[in-house]
Amino acid sequence: MSKKCEICGKSRTFGNNRSFSLRSSNRSWAPNIRKVRALVDGKPKRINVCTRCLRSGLVERPQFIKTTEEE
């Protein structure tokens, strides 16, 4: 699964771990990515989205219509 948001483009950032003696080792921070069904060009599609885009309402979710069959 890719660690990149398809809405805002947020991806991994890189930095260092710093020990008590101030030696550094490389590390990375990954965004909180969720795979959700969203409407893309009016059609439902499964995309990778960060939780900030989900919470801010930038993702339009498809509506599921419950059908009842009459007997």
From Swiss-Prot:
Keywords: Ribonucleoprotein, Ribosomal protein. It holds the Pfam family Ribosomal_L28. Belongs to the bacterial ribosomal protein bL28 family. This is Large ribosomal subunit protein bL28. Gene3D superfamilies: Ribosomal protein L28/L24. It comes from Finegoldia magna (strain ATCC 29328 / DSM 20472 / WAL 2508). One of its GO terms (biological process) is translation. One of its GO terms (cellular component) is ribonucleoprotein complex. It comes from the Bacteria. GO terms for molecular function: structural constituent of ribosome. The keyword GTP-binding does not apply. SUPFAM superfamilies: L28p-like (SSF143800). PANTHER family: 50S RIBOSOMAL PROTEIN L28, LARGE RIBOSOMAL SUBUNIT PROTEIN BL28A.
